[in-house]
């Protein structure tokens, strides 16, 4: 991706380099069983399809050997709750709910983008059909809300559901804006970041706010953690776009240059097209050509984005957003876990 993102040492403190990965594994261990029970409670064939999408088993229910996701959003809930003095048990249902919402968006995303592969194997829509994939996404969304209705404190449950549903509305708007950006002759970096604020940052901000909420934090702390998660989500999307162009297909589970082949208006591309360089002119011609991108076109587009500085802009943006995220944290909740999850974004490969 043209270099690894680095953060100012003042923001990092003495956080162990492997803490972030340990937090993801802990989130998987704590949240996974609740997620399994939620999926198994669904009627067939929804349960089988949901477990397939989550990477737990194959279409015939035989054990799958692939990835089952990172549990990054669940880890954000746990870390935010812990930073506010909350209990893991209280945060677990919320963690499961946000993972379900995240996966509902992935199911719909795959349909809208026409992606036939996720995590190295066929997507749900390409196995069972478009209509089924949409309905499964709806079912995961409904199951997430059902989990939150079971929270012990009814007041917290209502506030949590309200926040989650507002973030879902923001997600829909962000996804709609993403659709509008495709094929637009002129898209600015600000246009892109406004879209990413809804498509990605809304949910990561919600995750952190919900963690603080179940820990009974005050409104100011909840707002600060939501801002932290929002900025982190923008950084996550920036890095996601870098991976979409320069990521290793063996790690990402998607074809090389997948975003470029589909002429997606990702941040590196948008930045490159706005560079007013010769490379930008040639890249614009490739993006506006009526014929589908060939493998050589994708290779050339990749080189042009790099020459025009698109990768550098996206890296810098991710770095700035992570620093803004950490700066948003009050000292009382600036925990090693939250810092470690911030660092993890810099080092992610898929």
Curated annotation (Swiss-Prot):
One of its GO terms (cellular component) is cytosol. Keywords: Lipid biosynthesis, Lipid metabolism, Magnesium, Metal-binding, Transferase. Its EC number is 2.5.1.29. Pfam families: polyprenyl_synt. It is an enzyme of class 2 (transferase). It catalyses: isopentenyl diphosphate + (2E,6E)-farnesyl diphosphate = (2E,6E,10E)-geranylgeranyl diphosphate + diphosphate. Pathway: Isoprenoid biosynthesis; geranylgeranyl diphosphate biosynthesis; geranylgeranyl diphosphate from farnesyl diphosphate and isopentenyl diphosphate: step 1/1. GO terms for molecular function: geranylgeranyl diphosphate synthase activity; metal ion binding; prenyltransferase activity. Mg(2+) 1 binds at residues 109, 113. InterPro entries: Isoprenoid_synthase_dom_sf (IPR008949), Polyprenyl_synt (IPR000092), Polyprenyl_synt_CS (IPR033749). Mg(2+) 2 binds at residues 109, 113. A motif (DDXXD motif) lies at residues 109-113, 240-244. Its cofactor is Mg(2+). It comes from the Bacteria. CDD domains: Trans_IPPS_HT. GO terms for biological process: geranylgeranyl diphosphate biosynthetic process; isoprenoid biosynthetic process. Binds 2 Mg(2+) ions per subunit. Isopentenyl diphosphate binds at residues 70, 73, 102, 119. Belongs to the FPP/GGPP synthase family. Catalyzes the condensation of isopentenyl pyrophosphate (IPP) with (2E,6E)-farnesyl diphosphate (E,E-FPP) to yield geranylgeranyl diphosphate (GGPP). Contains two aspartate-rich DDxxD motifs, designated as FARM (the first aspartate-rich motif) and SARM (the second aspartate-rich motif). NCBIfam families: GGPPsyn_IdsB. This is Geranylgeranyl diphosphate synthase. It comes from Mycobacterium tuberculosis (strain ATCC 25618 / H37Rv). The gene is idsB.
């Amino acid at each position: 991706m043209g270099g690894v993102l680095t953060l100012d040492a003042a923001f990092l403190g003495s956080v162990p380099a492997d803490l972030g990965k340990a937090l993801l594994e802990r989130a998987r261990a704590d949240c996974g069983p609740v997620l399994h029970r939620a999926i198994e409670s669904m009627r067939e064939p929804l349960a089988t399809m949901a477990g397939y999408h989550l990477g737990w088993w194959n279409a015939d229910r035989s054990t799958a050997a692939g990835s089952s996701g990172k549990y990054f959003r669940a880890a954000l809930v746990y870390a935010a709750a812990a930073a506010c003095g909350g209990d893991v048990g209280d945060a677990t249902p919320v963690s499961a709910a946000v993972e379900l919402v995240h996966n509902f968006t992935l199911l719909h995303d795959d349909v809208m983008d026409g992606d036939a592969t996720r995590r190295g194997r066929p997507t749900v829509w390409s196995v069972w059909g478009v209509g089924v994939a949409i309905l499964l996404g709806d079912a995961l969304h409904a199951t997430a809300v059902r989990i939150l209705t079971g929270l012990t404190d009814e007041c917290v449950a209502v506030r949590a559901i309200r926040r989650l549903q507002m973030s879902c509305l923001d997600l829909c708007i962000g996804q709609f804006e993403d659709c509008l950006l495709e094929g637009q002759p002129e898209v600015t970096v600000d246009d892109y970041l406004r879209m990413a604020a809804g498509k990605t940052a809304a949910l990561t901000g919600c995750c952190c706010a919900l963690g603080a909420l179940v820990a009974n934090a005050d409104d100011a702390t909840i707002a600060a953690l939501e801002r932290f998660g929002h900025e982190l989500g923008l950084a996550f999307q920036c890095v996601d776009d870098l991976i979409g162009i320069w990521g290793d297909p063996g790690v990402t589970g998607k074809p090389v240059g997948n975003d470029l082949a589909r002429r997606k208006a990702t941040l590196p591309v948008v930045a490159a097209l706005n560079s007013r360089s010769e490379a930008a002119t040639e890249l614009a011609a490739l993006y506006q050509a009526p014929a589908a991108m060939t493998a050589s076109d994708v290779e050339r587009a990749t080189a042009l984005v790099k020459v025009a500085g698109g990768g550098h802009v996206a890296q810098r943006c991710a770095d700035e957003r992570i620093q803004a995220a950490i700066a948003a944290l009050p000292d009382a909740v600036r925990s090693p876990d939250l810092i470690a999850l911030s660092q993890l974004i810099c080092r992610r490969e898929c």
